[in-house]
């Protein structure tokens, strides 16, 4: 089918969601061999969608999530003064974690920075999380973060050793 019209009276938004959710779940169970990822559809508020995904219609298959890391720049063991000053003036700092990118060539990072500029941004700062004896950060701004601040950043963002963080 291409379209489904529902005639419902005296209902709330949740009633419509429940009916459509059950209809779609049962349809896919009956006619598809694929296993459903979930039987309850995730519900994301408009504000959360814009903050976490940068759009009001996110593709949840895309693992990139925008994280607010503003609080990191109030720490004494973070010395990235440009961002610290911005945060003091009320700005927010958000980042995206890219998984398993420690072995990517420099051109990978340069191309992402170029893309951000083409899209109207002023560029991206980034670093990759590594662990030799201790957790450290490699990249243009890596030296501004202590081991403890990186651990906190990893906790906030879900980043792991080998991931890169773009601000």
Predicted features by range, described:
Residues 1-167:
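Class II aminoacyl-tRNA synthetase catalytic cores and aaRS-like
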């Amino acid at each position: 089918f291409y379209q489904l019209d529902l005639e419902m009276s005296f209902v709330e938004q949740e009633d419509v969601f429940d009916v459509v959710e059950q209809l779609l779940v049962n349809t896919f169970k009956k006619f598809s061999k694929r296993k459903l990822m979930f039987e309850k559809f995730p519900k994301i508020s408009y504000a959360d969608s814009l903050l976490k995904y940068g759009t009001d219609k996110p593709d949840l298959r895309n693992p990139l999530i925008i994280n607010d890391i503003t609080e990191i720049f109030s720490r004494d063991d973070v010395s990235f003064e440009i961002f610290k000053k911005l945060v003091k003036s009320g700005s927010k700092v958000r980042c995206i974690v890219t998984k398993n990118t420690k072995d990517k060539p420099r051109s990978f990072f340069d191309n992402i920075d170029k893309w951000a500029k083409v899209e109207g941004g002023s560029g991206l700062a980034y670093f990759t999380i590594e662990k030799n004896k201790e957790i450290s950060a490699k990249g243009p701004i890596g030296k501004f973060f202590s081991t403890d601040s990186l651990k906190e950043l990893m906790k906030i963002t879900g980043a792991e050793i080998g991931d890169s963080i773009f601000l």
